């Protein structure tokens, strides 16, 4: 068992040891119908193998709809546990490349989707301001956001480790 991981989760009020592996979580998961997400396996792996669960791609397939958590006969906060596992994974530098890219874009330009010249042109053709009312339009706000993200150490969190 991954005692350290279980202690971390339990400290957050997420006790996974009462799971009886009935599979209701997996059977009721809307995301699992279309992806490889198997919540029961994630819970099992969290109990057995820290490295495996934190580096599992499927950990990121959960849409956080809370269906599994609402239907769990033992009342295990499964979705909350998955969110905490994700937080732990990110702290260890384990992040999907797509998430890292979006995070880097936010750090760089204050927005997950940067504006390119083509998008600005299309906006103008539609009668819109080429730059929407976001921090991208206000250099002072952008600098404020960057300062906030650095103060929160978001830049360190998303840096490749």
From Swiss-Prot:
Residues 10-40, 51-82 form the 4Fe-4S ferredoxin-type domain. The keyword Nucleotidyltransferase does not apply. One of its GO terms (molecular function) is metal ion binding. It catalyses: coenzyme B + coenzyme M + 2 oxidized [2Fe-2S]-[ferredoxin] = coenzyme M-coenzyme B heterodisulfide + 2 reduced [2Fe-2S]-[ferredoxin] + 2 H(+); coenzyme B + 2 oxidized coenzyme F420-(gamma-L-Glu)(n) + coenzyme M + 2 reduced [2Fe-2S]-[ferredoxin] + 4 H(+) = coenzyme M-coenzyme B heterodisulfide + 2 reduced coenzyme F420-(gamma-L-Glu)(n) + 2 oxidized [2Fe-2S]-[ferredoxin]. Pfam families: Fer4_8. One of its GO terms (cellular component) is cytoplasm. The keyword Protease does not apply. It is found in: Cytoplasm. Its cofactor is [4Fe-4S] cluster. Pathway: Cofactor metabolism; coenzyme M-coenzyme B heterodisulfide reduction; coenzyme B and coenzyme M from coenzyme M-coenzyme B heterodisulfide: step 1/1. Keywords: 4Fe-4S, Cytoplasm, Iron, Iron-sulfur, Metal-binding, Methanogenesis, Oxidoreductase, Repeat. Its EC number is 1.8.7.3, 1.8.98.4. [4Fe-4S] cluster 2 binds at residues 29, 62, 65, 68. [4Fe-4S] cluster 1 binds at residues 19, 22, 25, 72. The ferredoxin/F(420)H(2)-dependent CoB-CoM heterodisulfide reductase is composed of three subunits; HdrA2, HdrB2 and HdrC2. Belongs to the HdrC family. Part of a complex that catalyzes the reversible reduction of CoM-S-S-CoB to the thiol-coenzymes H-S-CoM (coenzyme M) and H-S-CoB (coenzyme B). Catalyzes the transfer of electrons from ferredoxin to CoM-S-S-CoB during methanogenesis from acetate. Electrons transfer from ferredoxin to CoM-S-S-CoB via HdrA2, HdrC2 and HdrB2. In addition, the complex can use electron bifurcation to direct electron pairs from reduced coenzyme F420 towards the reduction of both ferredoxin and CoB-CoM heterodisulfide. This activity may take place during Fe(III)-dependent anaerobic methane oxidation. This is Ferredoxin/F(420)H(2)-dependent CoB-CoM heterodisulfide reductase subunit C. It comes from Methanosarcina acetivorans (strain ATCC 35395 / DSM 2834 / JCM 12185 / C2A). The gene is hdrC2.
